[in-house]
Amino acid sequence: MSDFAKVEQSLREEMTRIASSFFQRGYATGSAGNLSLLLPDGNLLATPTGSCLGNLDPQRLSKVAADGEWLSGDKPSKEVLFHLALYRNNPRCKAVVHLHSTWSTALSCLQGLDSSNVIRPFTPYVVMRMGNVPLVPYYRPGDKRIAQDLAELAADNQAFLLANHGPVVCGESLQEAANNMEELEETAKLIFILGDRPIRYLTAGEIAELRS
């Protein structure tokens, strides 16, 4: 086995492990959600359409070219289009996680959200792991406009909320994207737990210090 083949096999196993962990801990249910990562050769490895994140076969993961051509493995999800849009427009993005996790999806269904940043920072981890979290308007799943909107937002952001749909998070590795996704989900949960109670938000100075 070549060095490249060994790296690819390791990444396949990592994707399967992380996906299974999401499923086992209730971040994903049924066949909802999809993950992807960039391979060293520029191709994309992604979870197949209709697959359960808790029961993936490393050898059946979808391999997709940078132009969207399906190369091998099972058929990729139609949502791989917006994964590609993120990779093309943010060179730091090496992996993407999209889930329908409970708390973040619930947050995406609320009216009156600030579309430029749905989460006003109240913990340092929101700032350090995610930064701003812009809202993408609702479109039917698979609609090309999701990819178009994410492409416009990708350069300056790494976490997004699809209205009435769920979260999308990038990372410089699949593990980092997974960690960022979990931080987003736990932050959304805190928003609902806090409810109408007065929240002590971080000041502009505190946010600037975290970003420096």
Swiss-Prot record:
EC number: 4.1.1.104
InterPro entries on file: Aldolase_class_II_sugar_metab (IPR050197), Aldolase_II/adducin_N (IPR001303), Aldolase_II/adducin_N_sf (IPR036409), OtnC (IPR050013)
GO terms for biological process, alphabetical: pentose catabolic process
GO MF annotation list: aldehyde-lyase activity; metal ion binding
Pfam family, one: Aldolase_II
Domain of life: Bacteria
Active site: E79, Y125
Family membership noted in the UniProt record: Belongs to the aldolase class II family. AraD/FucA subfamily.
Function: Catalyzes the decarboxylation of 3-oxo-tetronate 4-phosphate to dihydroxyacetone phosphate (DHAP) and CO(2).
NCBIfam families tied to this protein: OxoTetrPhDc, PRK08130.1
Name under which the protein is recorded: 3-oxo-tetronate 4-phosphate decarboxylase
Organism: Escherichia coli (strain K12)
Lineage: Bacteria, Pseudomonadati, Pseudomonadota, Gammaproteobacteria, Enterobacterales
Gene that encodes the chain: otnC
